[in-house]
């Protein structure tokens, strides 16, 4: 008799994706982040669901409903902090996952890569709207500043902003719709993640060497299921260390002050995972220019496959490209630091230099390094 997991219509899909899937025998721990992102998403949806049971999306009660969750709801504090810090873990895994894709040339799977970029945008939108919901000072002013950027769009900008606000400022209507969007988007992310996997399983996984591994495949289960469980345990360990010891380490103290449209915080800044993009936005004195640079800082990922000039797929055997990659990582860390600093000398010039370097590295230096390495192969 044939095994039920290979014949049952539903079990067959699970089997082909997680059990009998042929996987390269040499994929490293950098390939763990896909499953970790799935775990983060499930965790966020579950904690978010329980938070939504007690949260009220009204400007008069939103802030106190979050305080009520933390003080009066059974284990409400742990659910709230798991959700807030879970978002940070989500973005750490996302950045690692994208970095892995860049380093090992996984972006040559075009459909998988492009769906991944859409996933990144959607996740960023979800996180931004979630940050507005507690209705603290940084929530309110963050929403005001970021939505206001759309007014830089010629001709329709102002109308577009007022349409998104549902009025003439960030108010009740804005909060209610942000809650609605924040609730629905994770399910759209889950659907997109399935499309992402669907495209990946058309080609099979890449591996550190970037060379075809068709001749040497092993089943996903038990080898990579056990490896993913180890990764998941480490993820949960780090998350719970954050939640139980320093739950507010990555947050902003200003968000413990209820939103007040009449008093602007001295330094408006987003959550840490948006700081690199925020630094790029601020480094350009022109409003429209800044908005374009902000969008392009992420959208540039779509261009990466077109800029791949190397004869080799992975950076494993390309030392010059490796150097440039790690300079890019250092540059992004610099931008993240700058995004959290006030707009004054010397931070302004450092931010501008780091922003120029970011685009220069991806658009010019990486393709040039690849071409040099191609020529070195002839020697």
UniProtKB/Swiss-Prot annotation:
Native source species: Addax nasomaculatus (Addax)
Domain of life the protein comes from: Eukaryota
Membrane disposition: Multi-pass membrane protein
Residues where heme b b562 binds: 83, 182
PANTHER family: CYTOCHROME B
Protein name: Cytochrome b
Family as reported in the entry's similarity comment: Belongs to the cytochrome b family.
Key word Heme present: yes
């Amino acid at each position: 008799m044939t095994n039920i997991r290979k014949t049952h219509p539903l079990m067959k899909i699970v089997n082909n994706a997680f059990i009998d899937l042929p996987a390269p025998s040499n994929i490293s721990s950098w390939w763990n982040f896909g499953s970790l992102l799935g775990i983060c998403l499930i965790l966020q949806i579950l904690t978010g669901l329980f938070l939504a049971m007690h949260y009220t999306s009204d400007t008069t009660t939103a802030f106190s409903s979050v305080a009520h969750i933390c003080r009066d709801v059974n284990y409400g504090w742990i659910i709230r902090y798991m959700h807030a810090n879970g978002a940070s873990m989500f973005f750490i895994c996302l950045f690692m996952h994208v970095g892995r894709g860049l380093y090992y040339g996984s972006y040559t799977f075009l459909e998988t890569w492009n769906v991944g970029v859409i996933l990144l945008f959607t996740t960023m939108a979800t996180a931004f709207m979630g940050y507005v919901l507690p209705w603290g000072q940084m929530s309110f002013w963050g929403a005001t500043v970021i939505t206001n950027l759309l007014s830089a769009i010629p001709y329709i900008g102002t109308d577009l902003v007022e349409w998104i606000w549902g009025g003439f400022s960030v108010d009740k209507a804005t909060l209610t719709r942000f809650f609605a969007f924040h609730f629905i988007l994770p399910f759209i992310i889950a659907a997109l993640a399935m499309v992402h996997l669907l495209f990946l399983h058309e080609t099979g996984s890449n591996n550190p060497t970037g060379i075809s591994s068709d001749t040497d495949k092993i089943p996903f289960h038990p080898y990579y299921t056990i490896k993913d469980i180890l990764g998941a345990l480490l993820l949960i360990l780090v998350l719970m260390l954050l939640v139980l010891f320093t739950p507010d380490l990555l947050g902003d103290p200003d968000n413990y002050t209820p939103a007040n449209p009449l008093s602007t915080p001295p330094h408006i800044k987003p959550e840490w995972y948006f700081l690199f993009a925020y630094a790029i936005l601020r480094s350009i004195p022109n409003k429209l220019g800044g908005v374009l640079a902000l969008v392009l800082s992420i959208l540039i990922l779509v261009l990466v496959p077109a800029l791949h000039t190397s004869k080799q797929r992975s950076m494993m055997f390309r030392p010059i490209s490796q150097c440039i990659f790690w300079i890019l990582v250092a540059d992004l860390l610099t931008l993240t630091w700058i995004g959290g600093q006030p707009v004054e000398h010397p931070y302004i010039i450092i931010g501008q230099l780091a922003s120029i370097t970011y685009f220069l590295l991806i658009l010019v230096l990486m393709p040039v390094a690849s071409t040099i390495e191609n020529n070195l192969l002839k020697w």
